[in-house]
Amino acid sequence: MVIKLSFHVCSHILNYFCSYISGYKNRFQNFIKHLREMGDEVIVVTNHEGVPQEFHGAKVIGSWSFPCPLYGKVPLSLALSPRIISEVAKFKPDIIHASSPGIMVFGALAIAKLLSVPLVMSYHTHVPVYIPRYTFSWLVEPMWQVIRFLHRAADLTLVPSVAIIKDFETAHVISANRIRLWNKGVDSASFHPRFRSHEMRVRLSDSEPDKPLIIHVGRFGREKNLDFLKMVMDRLPGVRIAFVGDGPYRTELEKMFEGMPAVFTGMMQGEELSQAYASGDVFVMPSESETLGQVVLESMSSGVPVVAVRAGGIPDIIPGDAEGRTSFLFAPGDLDDCVGKIRLLLTDDEFRGDMGRTARAEMEKRDWRAASKTIRNEFYSSAIDYWRKKQADIVQPLQWLAQMFMPAPNRVIGGGIKQ
């Protein structure tokens, strides 16, 4: 194992500071904050939109970007200009950490190879699942080929859930010894039951705070299966729902819920977001393709029970032994089970309160700092070890060939006899 008092880490992260809503953006921001607190030097390469000069003491380098053709609010950038290569070279990183998949990861790969630096890739968006919903199903296998190419070129891959590890094994992406699970963390101080607010509940309920209130927080995309919530609400008369967030599917969603007891607040941040979480009764997560499920963690940390699909990375947050104690899961597409569990929580205040407190206690164990320490002290060191072994595997055959075909220099031994 390689032990260092201080790493020089270069992070290539798309959509790091822009208005695009995502759990992985929040995850990286918390991760870099903790790296800086542990004394590591960090530079961040990201798209140019809304980029500050620094973040918690980490220098931020913006790269020219352009809108994604299929998802206009997502900026894309290769981050491979001479300026960026020069900045990274001057920084002399011990490791490059890139988010995958995306265009920027190709730039990170090129720079890592050019500068001969170990490369860690963390996989955050399960694109093969989304492709059929946005384009054509026949593109799924080519996407897997791209993923194989990228992650086989990396020294270590981090994934957000056990489900993704299984998918990678099934698709023969990389060997199991080069995959690690990036444990989920939550800011339990910022997402706390103490932020429950009557004023916020009035706002979320359209001035009907005494009505049962379902809350959903996140990015509104077609792939999030938000249509399912319409069917849920059709089965729950007298119940209100609040949507907190934004995204390309918002306009269609507002039309879908027109005339229904629904409120769309738009994006919230900071204490306002903390109040929104804590002021609901039940959080419902219908998405079947969540790799991370950060909003589920934040709701449970706020003391609000969750009813979520048993899919993707959610069972890592609510495992079998915790189901029914910290929150509920339902099978994909099982409307009856979902509605039944929501109804139970909304009609039994004591049970809902107990579950919320148990969820909160569980989330207090999921500390961002502990997860960040594991990556820094264990995963980065494993990547560096693997990279060094790979370098040695390349150099040793070359040395052997040199010894075979190049004559050794004459050496003088003993009393001057040449050998």
What are these regions (language model features)?
Residues 269, 288:
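Aromatic "clamp/platform" in nucleotide-sugar-dependent glycosyltransferases that forms part
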Residues 337, 344, 351-365:
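A short, well-ordered alpha-helix in the C-terminal region of glycosyltransferases
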Residues 118-120, 129-149:
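Nucleotide-sugar donor phosphate/pyrophosphate-binding loop at the beta->alpha transition
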Residues 320-335, 344-349:
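Conserved acidic donor-binding segment of nucleotide-sugar-dependent glycosyltransferases
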Residues 1-64, 368-369, 390-419:
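N-terminal subdomain of nucleotide-sugar transferases
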Residues 163, 185:
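Carbohydrate-associated surface elements
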Residues 305-308, 318:
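Short hydrophobic beta-strand element within catalytic cores of glycosyltransferases
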Residues 88, 267-268, 275-280:
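Short alpha-helical donor nucleotide-sugar binding micro-motif in glycosyltransferases
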